[in-house]
Structures are given as structure tokens and as C-alpha cells.
Amino acid sequence: MASKLFLAAALLQGALSSPLAVEERQACAAQWGQCGGQDYTGPTCCQSGSTCVVSNQWYSQCLPGSSNPTTTSRTSTSSSSSTSRTSSSTSRPPSSVPTTPTSVPPTITTTPTTTPTGGSGPGTTASFTGNPFAGVNLFPNKFYSSEVHTLAIPSLTGSLVAKASAVAQVPSFQWLDIAAKVETLMPGALADVRAANAAGGNYAAQLVVYDLPDRDCAAAASNGEFSIADGGVVKYKAYIDAIRKQLLAYSDVRTILVIEPDSLANMVTNMGVPKCAGAKDAYLECTIYAVKQLNLPHVAMYLDGGHAGWLGWPANLQPAADLFGKLYADAGKPSQLRGMATNVANYNAWDLTTAPSYTTPNPNFDEKKYISAFAPLLAAKGWSAHFIIDQGRSGKQPTGQKEWGHWCNQQGVGFGRRPSANTGSELADAFVWIKPGGECDGVSDPTAPRFDHFCGTDYGAMSDAPQAGQWFQKYFEMLLTNANPPL
């Protein structure tokens, strides 16, 4: 009903503001609606104010940024191949990461979760020293909040409604998982923070840079839009240049970036996967380019650092330190490359007293133990790295995982610690929510495109899962129910 009401309102607004016939508007998808994709049979144009952007062969979406209705042809039938992630004590699989959602309704007004403490404005440059999360508040992700309010809440009842509303207010990261979002969503996200600061706040923006060519090389669920064989490195550098342009336009907004989840960790453990071996040089070149280009005074960057059940195994720690230490040096030791983000889209706890059975025999069975073991090895390579830890889905411990390497839509998990710079650790800058809880990790249907076997029910994944990035209501409700601290 909510979506129908929004569509009606959008149609009415279009009719009032434009001489075009209502019938023409009704033939085009509303903002955030689907406008193309494999086997899609709906509208292939967008209403005024949006443009149809191809995310992948299965999905195109109407994103803000065009003044006229636009069209896109349906993608041709094809398939993408990928080698599934491995699972062994020294080569643990990465966690899944979101791609563009299939339907995102209009954003709603949200309010920051903490009290404003000061601000800045256009024409100035934000700056900080040390921990970029210290002395600043985080702003809710309106893109994610809109999903919660219009995709999740309408079908909830009782106490879950209030819990979901609370989740919508928790600050989380906005993902730039396709190049088009740099021009459509990124300016709005930064403008929201600028406006809040102008009203007396002191807020930072949180973004994920995620569009490497041959992305997600060890899995199938989140393959991206760029291919190394088709000029992907050049296209990626243009994507980074576009991000830099937006950051310079909003130099008054302190911005925290997570750089390329599920990428370089594969270069440590998954060189036996042909796609990863073939992508290594491109991954390194692209990542170095990114951290050099985005090395701006108001920006803090964190490379993705896997998690305790991946790079945290003793046999993986030194090779990981060697790789990241060399990259840091090869990039010229960027001043704004603060450290690493761990546990992105995964389920690990921060600090446990008892090891879950599925973590045996790894002595680094939580993220605190992992970074405590990893940091000295990085320091020995010349990088005094600090860490941020994703706790968005780490509330329930132990989880329902059968094995630690099972990463996709795992059951028995819940929303976790709320974002905070009060970590009690000199190494940990902040607890954060990087993965948007409720967006699917990967499709569970073995016959579907982009199916990864880790997303099958035999691996503990929840059934009836849609494609990666699509809203997964049943999973979201589980996260609400199992939240710790409770919502």
C-alpha cells in the first residue's frame, strides 16, 4: 500500500509540474523503482528526476539525477562464472557484501542519534588528528533508513515495529557499489551531513568504496560491473576520480571511507582460485590508486582487513602483514590511510571469554584477539594501523553457524553493538555498522544466476533468499529478534 501511495503521489507531482500526459508518466517507473534486467517485464523508463542505471545484468534501477524520462534496454541473457570460496583452517572464506538493492523507496527524514556539537560549512576544509571517530557524531544512512521504513515496517507487527524504527536511526555506511551512485547518491549523502552541520551539528559521513574490476573474485554472489578484460582498471580509476571530485566539493564534511571489502584478503588466501590469481595485479594497482587519490585532509580511509576467521588464523597473519605493509609503502604511506576495517558483513564478536566451537583451533577467536595479533606485524612493516570493527550482525553469540567459514545469510545472528568510538582499546577506533542488515548476502536458489553454494541451506544459510542486495524481510526480522543489546 505504501508503495502504491508513493507512486500515486509521484504521478500527481509529475502531472502538476510538467505538461507531459499522465499516461506517459504512468508508463515509467518511479524513483528507486526497477527499470530493467534479465527476464524483467516492467517499465524500462524512469519518471522525471531519475535516470535508469544498469547495476548488473539482472537489475537496473531509477536513481535520482535526470530531468527527463530515460529508457534502458533489457539485458541479454548471459551468465557470470565464479569459483566458490574455499573453506580450510588457513584459507577461510570472506563475508558477503551488499550490491545495489532491487527496490529502494524514497528516502525519509531521519534525525541523528546523538546531540550536535558544532559545525562547519562550504568553503572550509574539515580536519582532524588521530581517531577520526573521536569528537564527531555519525549520521544515519537515509538510503538504508528508507528501506527499513518502506520495505520492512509495513509488514511488521507489535514490538518489531518500534525495533525496526530504532534500527533505521542507527548510523551505517552508504555503499558506492556501482559507479552511477557516485553521481546520484553520494552528493545527497554528503549534502545531508553538511546541512546537519550548518544547523549546529558536528557529523561525519560514512561511505564504502566498492567497485573493483573482477570484484568478489572468490565467490559468485556479489560480482560487480567492471571486468579486467574489458578495460576495468581504467574504468575503476575513473570511478575513483569521480569520488575524489565529490569529496573535494564537500571538503567541509569529515568523511570516513572503507576501501574495497572482500578484495585484498583474497590475495593472501585465495591465490589458488584462478580468478583471484588473475586479478591480483589489478587489485593492487586499483587499490593503490584509490588510497592515493582519496588521500585528502578531511578524509579517513580504512582498507578491508578480513576478519578473525579469515586472516586471523596464525598461518595467515604474517602473509597478510607482508601484503598490506608493502601496499602501504608502495602507495607512499598516505597520511589519511588510518588503518583497516574488519569483520565487514560478518558475524564475529568483539571480545569473548569462551571460544565458539566453530572457531576451534584458532586462538584468535574474536576480533579483539585478531587485531591484537595483527597490529604488531603491521607495525613491524612500518604501518601503525588502527581498526574499525563491523558489529552490525554480531549481536548473538555464539551464532548459528555450522562452520566459521559459512558467510552467507547465516541463521542465529542478530543486530549487534551500536556504533561508538568508546571501544576501550587503543587499536580500535570505533565499532561501526558497515553491512546494512536486511540486505541479502546471496540467492539461495541453486538454479538462479549468481548462486554461490555457500548461500545454500546445506551451509546454514536461510532459505528463500533473493539475489544479493535485495531486501530479505525474513532475515531482517531475525536480526531484530536476536539483537544484542536489545533494541
Curated annotation (Swiss-Prot):
Optimum pH is 4.5-9.0. Residues 1-17 form the signal peptide. PROSITE patterns: CBM1_1, CBM1_2, GLYCOSYL_HYDROL_F6_1, GLYCOSYL_HYDROL_F6_2. One of its GO terms (cellular component) is extracellular region. It catalyses: Hydrolysis of (1->4)-beta-D-glucosidic linkages in cellulose and cellotetraose, releasing cellobiose from the non-reducing ends of the chains. It comes from the Eukaryota. It is found in: Secreted. Residues 27-63 form the CBM1 domain. Induction: Expression increases during infection of rice. Optimum temperature is 30-50 degrees Celsius. Disulfide bonds join C35-C52, C46-C62. The biological conversion of cellulose to glucose generally requires three types of hydrolytic enzymes: (1) Endoglucanases which cut internal beta-1,4-glucosidic bonds; (2) Exocellobiohydrolases that cut the disaccharide cellobiose from the non-reducing end of the cellulose polymer chain; (3) Beta-1,4-glucosidases which hydrolyze the cellobiose and other short cello-oligosaccharides to glucose. Exoglucanase that plays an important function in biomass degradation by catalyzing the hydrolysis of the non-reducing end beta-1,4-glucosidic linkages in cellulose and cellotetraose to release cellobiose. Shows higher hydrolytic activities on phosphoric acid-swollen cellulose (PSC), beta-glucan, and cellooligosaccharide derivatives than on cellulose, of which the best substrates were cellooligosaccharides. Belongs to the glycosyl hydrolase 6 (cellulase B) family. This is 1,4-beta-D-glucan cellobiohydrolase CEL6A.
